[in-house]
Amino acid sequence: MTSSELSNVAMRFVATRRSGEVSALFSRPSDPRCVLVFAHGAGAGMQHPFMEAMVGQLANQGIATFRYQFPYMEQGSRRPDPRPILLATVHSAVATAAGVTDGLPLFAGGKSMGGRMTSMAAADSPLPDVRGLVFCGFPLHPAGRPATERGDHLLDVTIPMLFLQGTRDKLADLELIRPLCSRLGGRATLHVADGADHSFHVLKRSGRTDGEVLEELAREVSGWAVLS
């Protein structure tokens, strides 16, 4: 899909009373089937090249996206907000998206930290009208420190979850992700991108491009959303 076929509407909404307004982008293909509320990762905002590329691939699959900034990123800081602010921002973003998406089926998630914060928000209190969660590289543990505690709250999430994980992701050992998904039962779907790292970058010797990996991920989101 070309940029001319994708409608991008810049918006602002109140993240929290304390933090004030943040920016958002509603990107809508000509005939969307659903909407993904899509949060950025810890180190880069909603217009990072990964976010832009993934939005384009999702649009090719008929999926509109509602991207937004967390307050710290809006303010130009590199240090993430305290967790209560991050979680409140997720709830505010979902509520705002629900008001502008014309009743389309709604999903939520994000890249790395954005997906994790979305899942924590859903575990604390259901996200109204959200049918499922999408994680682009769920950060299960710090690099080099395999652990599973960051996934414990997922047991309290009651809606379907799609995990998109790379085999070279140093923040999510597949030997830990797989049993976690098994514990979650039918709520969890795991798709593994062969050769991809945490940024879904693949080495040249893999024989494919980063763009092809993102296309693969978008197809998975599309097929999963139909069933959720």
Q: What are these model-predicted stretches?
A:
Residues 13-106, 200-210:
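Serine-hydrolase catalytic machinery in alpha/beta-hydrolase-like enzymes
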Residues 38-42, 112, 166:
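Glycine-rich His-Gly loop
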Residues 90-159:
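Primarily recognizes the serine-hydrolase "nucleophile elbow" in alpha/beta-hydrolase
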Residues 156-158, 163-165, 169:
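Short beta-strand/loop motif that positions the catalytic acidic residue
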Residues 170-176:
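Conserved alpha/beta-hydrolase "acid-adjacent" motif
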Residues 183-201:
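Catalytic histidine neighborhood in serine/cysteine hydrolases
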Residues 204-228:
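Catalytic active-site module of serine/aspartate enzymes centered on a nucleophile-bearing elbow/loop
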